[in-house]
């Protein structure tokens, strides 16, 4: 569990045979080999740091994370940090600083570009935030630029790289949180819809869309308080909604052509489900529940 921004989230990542995670008790990052399951090894020292939103920069043998550094009688400082993985005790270095808060550091598939969102007091990320993009090398980042939100009138959510290295994100520039594609020079809507393809960013790693393949986005959106799922054909800008009994959905991810999410409804306890491209819904895991007659529930 991460303590960054107090609400935490995205406290682990997996690369090859290793799990990297933030330990709740001391907020240090540990490495755990998944095959041997031996004792986890701390790779960050004891200190004033907290970490979240971990990603692996394999090309440069390091982690990139949001770091929150606490000092007595001072406001905590947030920045993007690198943590070297080729030492027994990793060094923590600032990668990007200056804003009050950071989230969603994300590497392009070729690991040459890094994007992130940032915001500053007094705004919350759903009030006003910026999407930034920079080139990345062993020595750091170069040519950072704001590609969305520079006017202070946008809220950005979940930047995400497509399999073919195009950058997508969610913006509320039209007063609806819609998905956009950055084509290298400007931001274009993937689909214009009077619906919200995002949620307030209370925790790191929140996700409402992912790529089934280079041409298809699996997504969640909310309309009049009810959540829906579907697939967007990027080429034709067509949305295919999925008919299901669920009205509450969150935490979307895709794997091997399927959409996975946590879903529930007023009369259905939340469970992990998967949906294939033929809109077949499968329950993956449902917790044990008490049988309650729906007539006893307020509708």
Question: What kind of region is each of these model predictions?
Answer:
Residues 2-6, 21-30, 45-51, 66-80, ...:
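A flexible loop/linker signature enriched in serine peptidases of the S9 family
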Residues 6-14, 203-212:
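Signature of short aromatic-glycine-proline-rich micro-motifs recurring in repeat-based ectodomains
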Residues 14-16, 57-59, 109-110, 162-164, ...:
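Residue-level detector of Asp-centered blade-edge/turn motifs that repeat once per structural unit
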Residues 18-34, 38-41, 51-56, 60-63:
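Hydrophobic or amphipathic alpha-helical targeting/insertion segments
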Residues 19, 63, 114, 167-168, ...:
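Hydrophobic beta-strand positions that form the internal "hydrophobic ladder"
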Residues 33-37, 84-88, 136-139, 182-185, ...:
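Short loop/turn segments that connect beta-strands within beta-propeller blades
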Residues 39-45, 92-96, 142-148, 187-194, ...:
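Beta-propeller fold detector
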Residues 52, 64-67, 73, 103-104, ...:
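Non-catalytic accessory segments flanking enzyme active sites
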